């Protein structure tokens, strides 16, 4: 492909996501879209810019295929760690399957020792729940957010379908815990007497203690769920490329976000070509023509959105310096 069709890495195109940087009330920022459209690059760049204007920023990857470590060139894990070169930007990569294993390990072995067969049964049940990986990601996020104080949190999310389930999880879990609490009020005394006769729950807890912890979790989730639906506190940045499938996924995502009452008003269109008039690259010109068609559709569909057009660069966007541009 002719380099004349690309924009050098030093060039910067307007508009930007400046409105998000200026909105000082924002606490939760989600970045999502179809796989391979540049979500991680966008979320990393946004987090770096936020670190310039906010006291403390946490960047979290909830995608099982983590890319934050590759993007910044340093290793991240499930504990928040400062990004090299920053004193107010931290990052973490949540491993959902490992989180689930940790959760089950403590109670599972005790359950087996008691003869209930709880370990294997609970593990099979837990992993059969749709969206359980997003559920564990959310639980891990809550744990980190409660123990550490960050002014704004940026989520580098999984591909579209997983992201939407992740965002729906607070509502689903809140309803589920409320129903469980209702059932416990009706059948709690009877269950306590049965469990008491058989030695109680794993770890020596009784049902009331477990339900009390779950109620506390429900209250926390209810609070976060309310924040997710507050446009002053939460927004979702959609990332796409100027192709049919990506645009289709973006439209579906925006409709679902609207149904969840989650604010979204910014779209980043990545990998755009800008061939010069004297370019001899026919493939570049043809692709630019196709991209322009979908850019026109985006402009028509989302006239009230801040649409950010980003070029296809001549080099990989890796490392603090390139991400900062």
Curated annotation (Swiss-Prot):
Zn(2+) binds at residues 281, 284. GO terms for cellular component: GET complex. GO terms for molecular function: ATP binding; ATP hydrolysis activity; metal ion binding. ATP binds at residues 34-41, 243, 270. The active site is at 63. InterPro entries: Anion-transp_ATPase-like_dom (IPR025723), ATPase_ArsA/GET3 (IPR016300), ATPase_ArsA/GET3_euk (IPR027542), P-loop_NTPase (IPR027417). Its main location: cytoplasm. CDD domains: ArsA. Transmembrane segments: none annotated. GO terms for biological process: tail-anchored membrane protein insertion into ER membrane. It is found in: Cytoplasm; Endoplasmic reticulum. Keywords: ATP-binding, Cytoplasm, Endoplasmic reticulum, Hydrolase, Metal-binding, Nucleotide-binding, Transport, Zinc. It comes from the Eukaryota. Coiled coil: none annotated. Its EC number is 3.6.-.-. ATPase required for the post-translational delivery of tail-anchored (TA) proteins to the endoplasmic reticulum. Recognizes and selectively binds the transmembrane domain of TA proteins in the cytosol. This complex then targets to the endoplasmic reticulum by membrane-bound receptors, where the tail-anchored protein is released for insertion. This process is regulated by ATP binding and hydrolysis. ATP binding drives the homodimer towards the closed dimer state, facilitating recognition of newly synthesized TA membrane proteins. ATP hydrolysis is required for insertion. Belongs to the arsA ATPase family. Homodimer. PANTHER family: ARSENICAL PUMP-DRIVING ATPASE ARSENITE-TRANSLOCATING ATPASE, ATPASE GET3. This is ATPase GET3. The gene is GET3.
